[in-house]
Amino acid sequence: MRCGIVVNVTGPPPTIDRRYHDAVIVGLDNVVDKATRVHAAAWTKFLDDYLTRRPQRTGEDHCPLTHDDYRRFLAGKPDGVADFLAARGIRLPPGSPTDLTDDTVYGLQNLERQTFLQLLNTGVPEGKSIASFARRLQVAGVRVAAHTSHRNYGHTLDATGLAEVFAVFVDGAVTAELGLPAEPNPAGLIETAKRLGANPGRCVVIDSCQTGLRAGRNGGFALVIAVDAHGDAENLLSSGADAVVADLAAVTVGSGDAAISTIPDALQVYSQLKRLLTGRRPAVFLDFDGTLSDIVERPEAATLVDGAAEALRALAAQCPVAVISGRDLADVRNRVKVDGLWLAGSHGFELVAPDGSHHQNAAATAAIDGLAEAAAQLADALREIAGAVVEHKRFAVAVHYRNVADDSVDNLIAAVRRLGHAAGLRVTTGRKVVELRPDIAWDKGKALDWIGERLGPAEVGPDLRLPIYIGDDLTDEDAFDAVRFTGVGIVVRHNEHGDRRSAATFRLECPYTVCQFLSQLACDLQEAVQHDDPWTLVFHGYDPGQERLREALCAVGNGYLGSRGCAPESAESEAHYPGTYVAGVYNQLTDHIEGCTVDNESLVNLPNWLSLTFRIDGGAWFNVDTVELLSYRQTFDLRRATLTRSLRFRDAGGRVTTMTQERFASMNRPNLVALQTRIESENWSGTVDFRSLVDGGVHNTLVDRYRQLSSQHLTTAEIEVLADSVLLRTQTSQSGIAIAVAARSTLWRDGQRVDAQYRVARDTNRGGHDIQVTLSAGQSVTLEKVATIFTSRDAATLTAAISAQRCLGEAGRYAELCQQHVRAWARLWERCAIDLTGNTEELRLVRLHLLHLLQTISPHTAELDAGVPARGLNGEAYRGHVFWDALFVAPVLSLRMPKVARSLLDYRYRRLPAARRAAHRAGHLGAMYPWQSGSDGSEVSQQLHLNPRSGRWTPDPSDRAHHVGLAVAYNAWHYYQVTGDRQYLVDCGAELLVEIARFWVGLAKLDDSRGRYLIRGVIGPDEFHSGYPGNEYDGIDNNAYTNVMAVWVILRAMEALDLLPLTDRRHLIEKLGLTTQERDQWDDVSRRMFVPFHDGVISQFEGYSELAELDWDHYRHRYGNIQRLDRILEAEGDSVNNYQASKQADALMLLYLLSSDELIGLLARLGYRFAPTQIPGTVDYYLARTSDGSTLSAVVHAWVLARANRSNAMEYFRQVLRSDIADVQGGTTQEGIHLAAMAGSIDLLQRCYSGLELRDDRLVLSPQWPEALGPLEFPFVYRRHQLSLRISGRSATLTAESGDAEPIEVECRGHVQRLRCGHTIEVGCSR
């Protein structure tokens, strides 16, 4: 048997599709015939052998078995062998049912069955195939029955295994009892369908007999499939088969579509669709009948429902709209009188574009005459069926049976199918209609694709259309299939096919809700263009004093690398600083300062790939700082992550030139960056020389206060210049990381490569080309520069140089690479979007912050060994070190991209050995994570700090800030709460928590006089206070944040151990040598940790309230900006350690990480009474004593004020949003963005104003968003659910996308609901 070979089938193999088919009837006549012959042959062979072997006894007849003997004694009689033996005078004892010898009746029966089964495998091979196919149908939920004209076939079906797989059998005995005529009359098949509860028009017939196939065709069954293993396909097709297969394994069984009742309502879950539009522009396609019009008794009476014309008109003004109907095109145009639409008739065989141009399917025109003849024949054949309407259209014949009596419908459909089959036309079905069309591969889905190809690129970038198809009919399923992976299908619900299945993503209830949906979509699209585009950050005019700030704000990146938005023609200067950084590429240099040897590890500034300038007629090289600028505009497209610089200038010779540059760091190919430069001459003709280089002579000199330190991290470059490309190789001087940059520069005009002159340009550390081309006035030329950057740290890399060259060789042109990049960003925006309706400026800054977060930590980061650099990949402040900033970053990512958040935890887990060594050196068990780290997890905090106000170097004891470990533990537990991933706890999460908890238990020392555990000599989040007056660098005692969070970590470690399966828990305890005594001590510490208070306020640390009060007004009046109060006081010969003055939130961090209930519960465990009414006093106390010397301060203050519903929370939120764009830290943003503050602004929206918490395996919401600001919307993930949250004031709606995740519990201020996939709940909270 040939298995899986499709014979004589046009198009793909036949498919049993639950959208069109409810049941399958398998004809078994051939199987029964073959099995009966095999059964007779088995008995004949076995008994003839037995009678020959058996010794002759008196009265026994040993003659061979005859056909009459088989029929009388054995056919259909499992126990008939005893009667046969008696008739032959042979007497045998019954024996046992397990006998396998020939001296008992049972033995003979069993031995014969073995012979039968052996012959059956070769004689009836179809049996196993049919059984397997039937089981596939059952798994897919398709009802299945068997039909045969035979009687008494049970024993043969039992032997083939088929008796078990068919729930319904209709055989010759049943049809005889009912008086039904034999095949090819379809009566028997129709009775079988009836017993299955299926309509023949939605039922499939499968048979290998020509009479059975004819019966299927005569009965009007939806699909007739012939099984042919003997090359008789032509006869089977002529007998009525729609398709012929050699084996049922070739038939596809589809099961993935959903019942319409289970599909989410598009209006209720509109936010999901809106999210898809974050990075794409829609094109909307609609059916007419049942979608834009009500279903009516007479097709000619259909009209647009009220409001449809207005909705279509409004939507067409914002995006392409098409109506694709089964009606004739002229009919559609007459009923949809709205300008600006694509209109398609006859399922898209004929179309008219918005500009009036007419199109038709050329292949279909050959069928026009045949359709006309078919229409005439059908009119004649159906004239006796009352209510039947034959509608002849140019490219189809539709037979409507809405008004036909139920008992006549099957005959009508059968007649249409017979005629269509005979005429070579395609038969399709729809709402109370069966239709004949040209038998070519064309349907509404193909028409949708055809129109889509002619719409051109979407405004947001090439190939970023989102096709949306809305329809109600079975014929619309072709369109739903077309958009299944690239767009959105929306089915309009009706009951004429029951709760049928559909491939649509969403549903709408009726044409009126379709109008609501279209109007909502039009409104949203219109609103997006009415406002100043919140997807762009625009700088008008050139300002050298702000250029470095703009470079940081407009840096492009992809999680692997970041490249500052520097002018390509500019080298390092007071106004410009080219910088490119790859995550995790560090190098250490040594200096001698103030008699001390100082080692500093830095994120390395890599060779400048961007370097590009030009000159006209051999004049001066272009420099933005020296020409006369006539216009200048810089645009950062946040949606596309592309930076565009457009300028027009006049040079010393009076020549006016326009230059437009665009660049990106590919989110699709992380090692790739690209720059496109277009030069247009306005009033001159002459030569243009481009100089395109890769510059390896770069240093780390961005931060002024580091200039006294060594800055050259790269060795002398090796440069290889090729025809139109260059390869630069170098490595870091201490860490030995190989770096390769390959760049290709090509010139283009009107899509064609320009034949330009290339000359090598190179010196010690720079290499590339001078490229000359001639321009005439009004002409333009475009240089495309594509570069690839690799290091020896990259995975799956032979050498950095080979990889860079190979990647560059595979890279296409700029437009293609940019298109791939924009697509990747569209996918990211769909997962990470936040929408603030009507708040353009705030939304722009939120998107800027999201962009920089994703440019620093992206899905590519998950493939790297890299942490969260405090200043992103945008600059060199803090030397690119990893601090505790992941505490503000990871919770954002856990709820959006859990895999990326997991990679940040894995980064910390890989550095667990270093943290253990640090703890061991300090005399403790467990893990002590460093305050600052770079390449390997060692402590790399600076030993000396330069105060730029005083010019003095002072000791820097920041390595006492051990609370980084608390942040690591918090992120690990938050990740587990989001994902429910217990395997993470098994793999590494529990070990991480236990080792961090161990360290804090060891650091906490019992003070017998107080009966409390104390933690001494640390630095808290404040950072200002490194000690007490007179002991400036010894740390402070009992920092409240540290002590409380240490208890929190201990409890989470204990909980994590309890969550582990017994075997895994035992293995971990053995691995760590964790004793029962230790765990007892954990419990003791978690109940007796000391927490300082004064006057009902949580003290920042013990003794804080005894410090002097600062004259805040005096210092603000004298200095204005006092954010870095520590530097001001040190320059005055004073110390911030003397005062109740904090750099940033410290004690209030407890209210940032913990809910008030959690904090109060922890303090109660420790024996402290702390009431909710004490929280406002604590907040106010520290707000008045904080200089906000860190951008994180405003994040925490906004958080705690918003949770308390305080009116000034939004002031702090807006301060967070503007912290970098306004450079509120006084020039620090140019050194690198403040990544944690940017992430914090997102988290304020994502978790704070939503009240989103994860506690006790439950999602907790407590929305608190100012209603006047309009709705707040965003997607997130939780426990395998894809969720969308929409908040307005104190109410919210939460929608779960379709899927198979278990229901989740959602709590809102005491009220708990369960949310299932594909459903929406509303949470409204009483005041």
Curated annotation (Swiss-Prot):
Conditions for induction: A member of the dormancy regulon. Induced in response to reduced oxygen tension (hypoxia), low levels of nitric oxide (NO) and carbon monoxide (CO). It is hoped that this regulon will give insight into the latent, or dormant phase of infection.
Sequence positions that bind substrate: 884-885, 1143-1144
Active site: 1023
Key word Hydrolase present: yes
Keyword Electron transport tagged: no
Gene3D superfamilies xrefs: 1.50.10.10, Glycoside hydrolase, family 65, N-terminal domain (2.70.98.40), HAD superfamily/HAD-like (3.40.50.1000), Maltose phosphorylase, domain 3 (2.60.420.10), Putative phosphatase, domain 2 (1.10.150.240), Trehalose-6-phosphate phosphatase related protein, domain 2 (3.30.70.1020)
Biotechnology: This protein serves as an immunogenic antigen, inducing gamma-interferon responses in whole-blood cultures from M.tuberculosis-exposed adults in Uganda, The Gambia and South Africa, indicating this might be a good vaccine candidate.
Coiled coil regions, renumbered to chain: none
CDD domains given in the database record: HAD_TPP
E.C. designation(s): 3.2.1.-
Organism domain of life: Bacteria
Any single biological process term in GO: carbohydrate metabolic process
Family recorded in the similarity comment: In the N-terminal section; belongs to the trehalose phosphatase family.
Protein name: Uncharacterized glycosyl hydrolase Rv2006
Species name: Mycobacterium tuberculosis (strain ATCC 25618 / H37Rv)
